[in-house]
């Protein structure tokens, strides 16, 4: 009996070895993973487009058979809720967590827990101080403020009264961009900040705050605006006031602002609006997903994945008539705006990149994948 049992054990062991040997790389690649996307707040089109792009990337031929599930959650401006969502994602078997963190420090404990469980944690756009993350994908936020501030200073010839509008107070992105901008303005003694208010990264809020400031000070006391959100509504307030010449604005990359910078009459909404625009790339979340699978496949990434953030002026503005993948490739991803009939004025338009070549403007609008991708 002992001999028989020993023989059975040997046979089973050999069979197990044979099965292991027969597992091919393609079969190993068939393993599917749970992906979670955690955003610190919602309510603006930047994050809506960012999560749409992640959704679209997850449905491309490259990744659709490798993802068991994609879960997208928003903490709605509550860091404690976001920490709870991260912990719950870990307990439910997440392999990848992509995160736009609401706080640079309040999530560190939850992130460490995820790292200890072997979860790939990648932050995008907004940063955290916890060093265990796999990588952060984003821009140089200081330059995000400094670059547009320098552009506005040049448009004003180094002097004038400006309104200064940040984003959401206390968020790392807001803090660093504001510091970068004010550092530049400090070098121009002729530029004075005469009013300051938060835009909350919401065009409606920006419009309300700007209307209050203009009502209190009058248009003649204002020479320009630096803002993280609101250049388009700033121009609309001037149009409504029937001002002949628009004041320069430096701000983010909404489609309305970018269209307004185009030559008047070239497309509906074009106003020859003087300004400089630098939008934080929205495709960073989708790119983060590709980096997560790069790590799963044995590749390596640095702790900070810096992505480009071009400065858009009237001189280098390019309108894409369709915004589909074919046109993006033909124009070498130089498009800075699309017609307002395709994407509304409050839609953040920096949604495409050669680093995410499977996606187009419609991927950001609705999470769809271009044909063949």
Describe these PLM feature segments.
Residues 5, 22-26:
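Serine/threonine-rich, low-complexity intrinsically disordered segments
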Residues 1, 19, 249-252:
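Short, amphipathic alpha-helical segments
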Residues 1-12:
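Bacterial N-terminal signal peptides that target proteins for export
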Residues 13-22:
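Hydrophobic core
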Residues 26-373:
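A residue-level marker of the well-folded mature domains of exported/periplasmic proteins
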């Amino acid at each position: 009996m002992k001999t028989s049992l020993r023989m059975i054990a040997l046979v089973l062991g050999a069979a197990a070895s044979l099965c292991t040997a027969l597992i091919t790389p393609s079969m190993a690649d068939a393993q599917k993973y749970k992906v979670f996307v955690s955003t610190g707040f919602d309510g603006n089109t930047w994050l809506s487009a960012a999560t749409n792009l992640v959704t679209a990337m997850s449905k491309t031929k490259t990744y659709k058979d490798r993802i068991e599930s994609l879960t997208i959650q928003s903490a709605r401006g509550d860091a404690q809720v976001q920490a709870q969502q991260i912990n719950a994602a870990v307990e439910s078997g997440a392999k990848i967590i992509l995160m736009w963190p609401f706080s640079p420090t309040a999530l560190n404990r939850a992130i460490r827990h995820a790292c200890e469980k072997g979860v790939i944690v990648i932050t995008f756009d907004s940063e955290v101080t916890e060093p265990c993350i796999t990588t952060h994908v984003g821009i140089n936020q200081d330059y995000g403020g400094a670059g547009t501030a320098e552009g506005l200073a040049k448009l004003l010839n180094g002097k004038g009264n400006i309104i200064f509008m940040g984003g959401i107070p206390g968020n790392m992105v807001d803090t660093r961009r504001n510091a970068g901008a004010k550092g530049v303005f400090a070098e121009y003694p002729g530029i004075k900040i005469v009013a300051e208010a938060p835009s909350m990264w919401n065009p409606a809020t920006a419009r309300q705050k700007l209307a209050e400031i203009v009502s209190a000070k009058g248009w003649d006391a204002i020479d320009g605006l630096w803002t993280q959100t609101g250049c388009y509504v700033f121009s609309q307030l001037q149009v409504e006031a029937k001002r002949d010449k628009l004041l320069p604005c430096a701000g983010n990359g909404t489609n309305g602002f970018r269209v307004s910078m185009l030559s008047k009459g070239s497309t509906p909404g074009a106003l020859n609006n003087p300004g400089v625009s630098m939008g934080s790339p929205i495709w960073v979340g989708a790119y983060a997903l590709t980096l997560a699978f790069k790590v799963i496949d044995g590749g390596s990434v640095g702790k900070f994945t810096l992505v480009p953030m071009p400065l858009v002026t009237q001189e280098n503005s390019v309108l894409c008539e369709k915004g589909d993948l074919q046109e993006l490739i033909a124009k070498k991803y130089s498009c800075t705006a699309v017609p307002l009939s395709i994407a509304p004025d409050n839609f953040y338009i920096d949604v495409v990149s050669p680093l995410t070549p499977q996606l187009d403007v419609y991927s950001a609008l609705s999470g769809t994948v271009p044909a063949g991708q």
